[in-house]
Amino acid sequence: MYLFINIIRRNFISKNNFPKANREIRAREVRLVGENGEMHGVVNIRKALDMAERASLDLVEISPNAVPPVCKILDFGKFKYESKKRLHEARKKQKIVVLKEMKFKPNISIGDFETKLRKIKEFLKDGDKVKISLWFKGREILHKEVGQELFKRIEVGLEGPIKIDQHAKMEGKQMIMIVSPDIKV
């Protein structure tokens, strides 16, 4: 019973994202790269561990899928710190684009239309994509041309650099258009 639970538990443990180091490396031979980048060729794992120990550094598996695996002698703590720092910087630089939605009805009043249009402009100014959906109820769906006219009014009202990702099209009982800010980098 204990063995069965242990096998199941082992499958659900999250894997460490860092490479194997020192005694965790299971290969018998490795392609060794020295601490200054010099190649030592294919060596026995024990010899590689001894070389790393003499340098007071760690043996880290850089490329585990290579045959034999590529290992480098380096300071593992420093390597982990720099890896986390690079990952943090990459996440910091990436822009998360959010898809906002604005819902309209075919018989919307002018004041409501202008308010929703202003809100769409704010979303676009913040760099978000906007999904504009027009909901038809009952027999309103017979007058799709009203929806087309409304979307034309929206396009005209959205002055400035915008990009229409998806032109107005029907999806079930609603007409959808997706716009995003046209940012030239």
Curated annotation (Swiss-Prot):
GO terms for biological process: ribosome disassembly. Keywords: Cytoplasm, Initiation factor, Protein biosynthesis. GO terms for molecular function: ribosome binding; translation initiation factor activity. It is found in: Cytoplasm. Pfam families: IF3_C, IF3_N. InterPro entries: T_IF-3_C_sf, T_IF-3_N_sf, Translation_initiation_fac3_CS, Translation_initiation_fac_3, Translation_initiation_fac_3_C, Translation_initiation_fac_3_N. GO terms for cellular component: cytosol; membrane. The keyword RNA-binding does not apply. SUPFAM superfamilies: Translation initiation factor IF3, C-terminal domain (SSF55200), Translation initiation factor IF3, N-terminal domain (SSF54364). IF-3 binds to the 30S ribosomal subunit and shifts the equilibrium between 70S ribosomes and their 50S and 30S subunits in favor of the free subunits, thus enhancing the availability of 30S subunits on which protein synthesis initiation begins. Monomer. Belongs to the IF-3 family. This is Translation initiation factor IF-3.
